[in-house]
């Protein structure tokens, strides 16, 4: 069984050191993308990625310093580097070494630049969302660039993990880079909904946190059979069979905590 997550825009400033790191499987395919990104100015990067000029300059510097081979001196493990809501739910820094070993076999992070990452794959800081209108040659976007490659890697990983299911905890933007019809495993997508004045609906900040929290639950409980996911009851959610379909499993929560404003890049408040 494999679990899929999206990456995050926010990256951690500091990460713990890890001995047994690995290299991204599709690193060679990332190199042509970086080569082209290196030619873009901060202004062009900001325009391409819909960023402030300050963040455009940050990413220009990132790509200018992007170099292989990846080592512990110039790169960091992916699971500790991403720092968005999903990864606040995952809390990778508090996972045990045994947890990380299980995650290395069963957790995959989809990426616009790296294609697909294992938790302990080294990566250098970047910003390149899968939906960015950026490609190479006649391939006009990243979906066309990656083509079947991501799906092929996932199929190999499914074979290695000995499972026949993919738990899709990634966003639709990233899962669009996977071709479900070519996957050798069944795809199950958990959906998290909170009760509001007009009934149950997806509250994105909570949904993202729960994607990470469910991934953590799967890792810590060594779950390899999809049916066991229905036992998940984190943060007040419960599986709702009447609201679910065969491949979309809905989890409902009746009472949600108040949203706390959080600072984003550039000091903005959400």
Feature annotation, model-predicted:
Residues 46-47, 106, 264:
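RNA-interacting cores
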């Amino acid at each position: 069984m494999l679990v899929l997550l999206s990456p995050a825009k926010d990256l951690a400033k500091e990460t713990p050191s890890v001995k047994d790191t690995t290299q991204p499987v599709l690193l060679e395919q990332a190199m042509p993308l970086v080569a082209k990104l290196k030619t873009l100015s901060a202004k062009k990067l900001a325009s391409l990625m819909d960023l402030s000029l300050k963040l455009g300059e940050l990413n220009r510097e990132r790509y200018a310093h992007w170099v292989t081979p990846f080592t512990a001196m110039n790169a960091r493990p992916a699971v500790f580097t991403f720092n968005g809501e999903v990864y606040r739910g995952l809390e990778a820094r508090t996972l045990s070494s045994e947890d990380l070993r299980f995650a290395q076999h069963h957790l995959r992070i989809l990426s616009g630049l790296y294609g697909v990452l294992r938790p302990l794959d080294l990566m250098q800081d970047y910003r390149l969302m899968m939906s960015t209108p950026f490609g190479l040659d006649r391939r006009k976007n990243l979906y066309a660039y990656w083509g079947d490659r991501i799906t092929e890697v996932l199929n190999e990983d499914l074979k290695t993990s000995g499972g026949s299911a993919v738990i899709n905890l990634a966003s639709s933007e990233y899962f669009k880079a996977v071709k479900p019809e070519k996957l050798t495993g069944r795809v199950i997508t958990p959906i998290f909904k909170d009760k509001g004045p007009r009934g149950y609906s997806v509250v994105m900040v909570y949904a993202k946190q729960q994607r990470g929290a469910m991934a953590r639950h799967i890792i810590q409980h060594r779950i390899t059979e999809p049916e066991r996911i229905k036992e998940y009851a984190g943060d007040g959610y419960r599986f709702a069979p009447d609201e679910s379909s065969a491949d979309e499993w809905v989890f409902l929560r009746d009472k949600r905590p108040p949203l706390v404003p959080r600072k984003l890049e550039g000091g903005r408040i959400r």
